[in-house]
Structures are given as structure tokens and as C-alpha cells.
Amino acid sequence: MRLSQFKQTKNVELVVDTNSLEEYRAPSNKSIRLCKDKRSFLDDKGYWNVYPIAFNPAQVFVVCPHCGKIHLHGRGQEPDFKYEGHRASQCLAGSNNGYIIKRGNHV
């Protein structure tokens, strides 16, 4: 989903201020606004590492470093909510190897 759609999502617990996400226009369509999370980084094995931007009771929300949209994944079960680990990116941004969701809110 795009950032504008995410901002309208109800019943989410934000981990970061959405104003801290860097917005940019999609190269293929300047009317589409995408975003980057400055906390994301590419590790030495070639995997993107991303951090949650929000949660709801069942899901974790992250900014996809491949397409610039917000993706959601299962949060896991209480009490641990083990959402971290490798995930497929679920986007059509060409061939990519997904990303690793990290626990925490690192800057």
C-alpha cells in the first residue's frame, strides 16, 4: 500500500512518526508517492534489513526497500510476537531476495 493509504489505516500502533519517512515520486508515474525508511540498510550478504513502522494486533507494517510501498506481514502469536526474520517482499519490483525484519526501532 502507498503511504497515503497507510496514513488512513485505523487501529495501528505507530512505532515511528510517518513524517520521518522520506517521500519520493515513482519514476514511472510522478503522481505516485512512495517512501523510504532511513533505518533500513543493506547487509554484507546482500539482504535488506528493515524495521517495523507500525503494528496492529495481527500484523507488522514495514517499508519495502525494493518498491517503496508499505507491506504487512503476520505478527506472530502472543506472548513473543516473533515477527522478525526473512520475508518475501510481496511486490512486483523486479527480481529481489526479500528482506529481513529486525526487532526494535533503531536509527
Name each region found by the language model.
Residues 27, 37-53, 73-76:
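Short Cys/His-rich Zn2+-coordinating modules
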Residues 1-37:
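Glycine- and charge-rich intrinsically disordered segments
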Residues 51-59, 80-85:
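Short, flexible, mixed-charge glycine/proline-rich loop motifs
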Residues 69-75, 96-100:
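Short functional micro-motifs and their immediate structural scaffolds
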Residues 80-107:
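Short metal-binding segments enriched for Cys and/or His
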